[in-house]
């Protein structure tokens, strides 16, 4: 029987001879097509021994479809540009106010365990939120990070309402990861209504600002980096 993600060892620290992960923060909004081209280039270089990279971006409003996307979950196909992508998962939204972290790591230098890598990405988000006194949680049947909403009406099955605050979708090539995670800081939450996010209709979406935290993206980035380093190891600012 497969172990639950909550029971996996979250540490994905590199082997002793590995160099620090480059840390890059994009200025302004990055076109999705540009990001994909850049990721493809970086992944090829990392597979050949280049330094690993985490790239933080914000995108203009758009929807992406993962490899498991159901066409019926694209509720408003003409609202924003839609991009098919090779990452895992279903439909998701990207836009201003959402921190997207493209995580390009060589798992051969760490642990060649995809489930543990997904759990580790969730753990980075959970630890980031914890630094802001927000309790993020993982669910075995739903990849991503969730926040309980006791102030909202109970669900039809009598359980507490939950909202998704972070989504994950990854792809691997030669054991090098790309795509990554998105954390809702202060996006326009109405923009998610054009899709069924991640194919799950029973739960809503939230953001840090929606939860009552008037945080800036730079504040979140500092905590995200600190959390990343506890799970994946040292980073260095890209020159």
Curated annotation (Swiss-Prot):
<dbReference type="InterPro" id="IPR045864">
    <property type="entry name" value="aa-tRNA-synth_II/BPL/LPL"/>
</dbReference>
<comment type="function">
    <text>Catalyzes the transfer of endogenously produced octanoic acid from octanoyl-acyl-carrier-protein onto the lipoyl domains of lipoate-dependent enzymes. Lipoyl-ACP can also act as a substrate although octanoyl-ACP is likely to be the physiological substrate.</text>
</comment>
<protein>
    <recommendedName>
        <fullName>Octanoyltransferase</fullName>
        <ecNumber>2.3.1.181</ecNumber>
    </recommendedName>
</protein>
<feature type="binding site">
    <location>
        <begin position="167"/>
        <end position="169"/>
    </location>
    <ligand>
        <name>substrate</name>
    </ligand>
</feature>
<comment type="pathway">
    <text>Protein modification; protein lipoylation via endogenous pathway; protein N(6)-(lipoyl)lysine from octanoyl-[acyl-carrier-protein]: step 1/2.</text>
</comment>
<feature type="active site" description="Acyl-thioester intermediate">
    <location>
        <position position="198"/>
    </location>
</feature>
<keyword id="KW-0963">Cytoplasm</keyword>
<comment type="similarity">
    <text>Belongs to the LipB family.</text>
</comment>
<feature type="binding site">
    <location>
        <begin position="87"/>
        <end position="94"/>
    </location>
    <ligand>
        <name>substrate</name>
    </ligand>
</feature>
<feature type="binding site">
    <location>
        <begin position="180"/>
        <end position="182"/>
    </location>
    <ligand>
        <name>substrate</name>
    </ligand>
</feature>
<keyword id="KW-0012">Acyltransferase</keyword>
<feature type="site" description="Lowers pKa of active site Cys">
    <location>
        <position position="164"/>
    </location>
</feature>
<dbReference type="InterPro" id="IPR000544">
    <property type="entry name" value="Octanoyltransferase"/>
</dbReference>
<dbReference type="Pfam" id="PF21948">
    <property type="entry name" value="LplA-B_cat"/>
</dbReference>
<dbReference type="InterPro" id="IPR004143">
    <property type="entry name" value="BPL_LPL_catalytic"/>
</dbReference>
<feature type="domain" description="BPL/LPL catalytic">
    <location>
        <begin position="48"/>
        <end position="236"/>
    </location>
</feature>
<dbReference type="GO" id="GO:0033819">
    <property type="term" value="F:lipoyl(octanoyl) transferase activity"/>
</dbReference>
<dbReference type="InterPro" id="IPR020605">
    <property type="entry name" value="Octanoyltransferase_CS"/>
</dbReference>
<dbReference type="GO" id="GO:0005737">
    <property type="term" value="C:cytoplasm"/>
</dbReference>
<keyword id="KW-0808">Transferase</keyword>
<dbReference type="GO" id="GO:0036211">
    <property type="term" value="P:protein modification process"/>
</dbReference>
């Amino acid at each position: 029987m497969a172990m639950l993600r909550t029971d996996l060892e979250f540490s994905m620290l590199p082997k002793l001879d590995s160099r620090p992960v480059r840390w890059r923060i994009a200025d302004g909004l990055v076109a999705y097509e540009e990001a994909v081209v850049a990721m493809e280039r970086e992944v090829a270089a990392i597979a050949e021994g280049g330094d690993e990279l985490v790239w933080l971006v914000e995108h203009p409003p758009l929807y992406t479809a993962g490899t498991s996307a159901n066409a019926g979950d694209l509720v408003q196909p003409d609202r924003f540009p839609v991009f098919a992508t090779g990452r895992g998962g279903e439909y998701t939204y990207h836009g201003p106010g959402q921190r997207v972290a493209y995580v390009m790591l060589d798992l051969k230098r760490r642990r060649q365990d995809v489930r543990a890598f997904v759990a580790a990405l969730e753990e980075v988000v959970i630890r980031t939120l914890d630094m802001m006194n927000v309790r993020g949680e993982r669910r075995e049947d739903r990849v991503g990070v969730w926040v309980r909403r006791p102030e909202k009406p109970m669900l039809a099955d009598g359980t507490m309402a939950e909202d998704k605050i972070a989504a994950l979708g990854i792809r691997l090539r030669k054991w090098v990861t790309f795509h990554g995670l998105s954390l809702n800081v202060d996006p326009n939450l109405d923009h998610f209504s054009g899709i069924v996010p991640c194919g799950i209709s029973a739960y809503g979406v939230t953001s840090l600002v929606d939860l009552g935290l008037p945080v800036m993206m730079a504040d979140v980035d500092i905590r995200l980096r600190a959390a990343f380093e506890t799970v994946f190891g040292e980073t260095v600012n890209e020159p």
